[in-house]
Amino acid sequence: MKVVIYFLIGFLLSFRLEAETIKIGSLQYGSVNWELKLIKELELDKKNNFNLEIVELASKNAAAVALQGGAVDLIVTDWFWVSRQRSEGRLFSFVPHSMAAGGLIAPKDSNIVNDVDLKNKKIGIAGGQVDKGWLIFRAFYKKKYGEDLLKLSKPIFGAPPLLNKKIKQKSFDAILTYWPYQAKLLTDENFEKIIDIKDILSELGIPSGMPVIGWVFKEKWGEKSTEIFKNFLKASDEAKQLMLESDDIWDDVRPFM
């Protein structure tokens, strides 16, 4: 009888541990991955009573497909994507993650002084045609000048690391990229920021401090996984706070960058 009881206890414990695993899809080159890796490195998931499984993906589209197909529980994406999905009857939810955004970067010798100089220019765009930065920038340009940048310029879409490499090779006149890759380029004195996405949001009348990206998940998953999600958000906040307050913690983050 004792053997049976021990077996049942072991089975229930293993089931409980499996139920507390949260799978998060993350871009290999994204800053979200830094945070998730730090959570694992410091065992903040164990501290907060869940197990984090990081599923590294190659692109934003791959992340969306993984979430829709149930391969992961969470991804980070923008509220444009969530809004579109919900309008088509696919119920995804959004919890704010970050207000960080990128911007338009150009070589100092490119003759691009401001956004009006983009006509017929080859622009590298991080992500795809429905990426938040590109949609925001197009809306801003349309409002300001009455023209669509999609038709006015020559956009080419690609992964941020590749865009950084290509603009240094003068393959682009400018790139619209995410903030970590913007920051890397701006350490090079040959490049400058033309306009920031945050400034564009302000021009469009969107309140300052509005998070652009967030944790996105199926509504049904959120309803049945409230506790583990709260635990994850707590670990996420702890990781962010450590990165904000400690210079030393970046030594742990650096290998993932």
Annotated model-derived regions:
Residues L12, E43, F140-K143, D252, ...:
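Generic structural signal for isolated residues within well-ordered alpha-helices
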Residues F15-A19:
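Sec/Tat signal peptide C-region and signal peptidase I cleavage site
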